[in-house]
Curated annotation (Swiss-Prot):
One of its GO terms (cellular component) is ribonucleoprotein complex. GO terms for biological process: translation. This is Large ribosomal subunit protein bL21. One of its GO terms (molecular function) is rRNA binding. The keyword rRNA-binding applies. This protein binds to 23S rRNA in the presence of protein L20. Keywords: Ribonucleoprotein, Ribosomal protein, RNA-binding, rRNA-binding. The keyword RNA-binding applies. Belongs to the bacterial ribosomal protein bL21 family. Part of the 50S ribosomal subunit. Contacts protein L20. It holds the Pfam family Ribosomal_L21p.
Length: 103
């Protein structure tokens, strides 16, 4: 059984026991959260698609870690004009472990 969920503007195909990295969610480490935006659920009798979400379906996940990804360097440069700009960015993420899919 798998589900397609949407969080942080992205979609993820998940199964029970999967670990996924999503955009930062404001939750404590080792807490349990419910993801209610379930777009599709695969059951024994077939695939159930939501319009736009599946009614009554939710995915329960445990927050395993909060962190930042690798640094991305953005460097702007204009020749002959003595213009240089160097910026760094580290995107915050949340690591989730899928515990249960309820549909």
């Amino acid at each position: 059984m798998y589900a397609v969920i949407a969080t942080g503007g992205k979609q993820y195909k998940v199964q029970e026991g999967d670990a996924i990295y999503v955009e930062k969610i404001a939750a404590e480490v080792d807490s349990t959260i419910e993801l209610n935006e379930v777009l599709a659920v695969s059951k024994e009798d077939g695939l159930v698609l939501g319009k736009p979400v599946v009614e009554g379906a939710k995915v329960v996940a445990k927050v395993e870690a909060q962190g930042k990804s690798k640094k991305i360097i953005v460097f702007k440069y204009k020749r002959k004009k003595d213009y240089r700009r160097k910026r760094g960015h580290r995107q915050a993420y949340t690591k989730l472990v899928i515990e249960k899919i309820q549909a």
